[in-house]
Amino acid sequence: MEADYSSWGSTVKTIISAMQKPNIWALFMHPPASTFFKGRVCLLGDAAHATTPHHGAGAGMCIEDGLILSSLLKEANSVDDLKRAFEVYDEVRRPRGLKNVVGSKEAGMLYDFELEGDDLDKIEKNFTTRLRWIWDEDLEAQVKKARTMYLQPTSNI
């Protein structure tokens, strides 16, 4: 860590030299999952799409997952229905969860001036638009879509 900050000012160097075990905290994300379920096990939230914290959307995504999954599970009356509910949940939720994983990583790179460099106008433009897809999601429409898919014959998935 000291080598990484060797060109910084004396204040930063003094702080780092006072640390007993200086290290850099690593941030991890889950590689894109090919599915959110297997058999009778279905994942949601961070178990399905663990991500870096830069969007601040992890808990919200988990709640959204729970909303969709619960709306499907209340229709299930058998083990076969459970599999169908998981298939539909996976198709509806996986793209959004994985988009958050990728987007959050990009946001971290943006915060560290790795995406737009130091062009503050480009950074500002990116910041003002990048989270709209999270904030403006129509969850009622997503529930309706999931239930419609669930009620269709299996061959349509």
Where are each of the predicted segments found?
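Conserved FAD/dinucleotide-binding core of flavoprotein oxidoreductases
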Residues: M1-I24
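Short linear interaction motif-like sites in intrinsically disordered regions of transcription factors
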Residues: G9, A26, I134-D136
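Secondary-structure junction/capping motif
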Residues: G9, T52-H55, D138
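C-terminal lid/capping helical subdomain adjacent to the catalytic/cofactor pocket in oxidative enzymes
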Residues: A47-A50, L67-N77, E87, E91-P95, ...
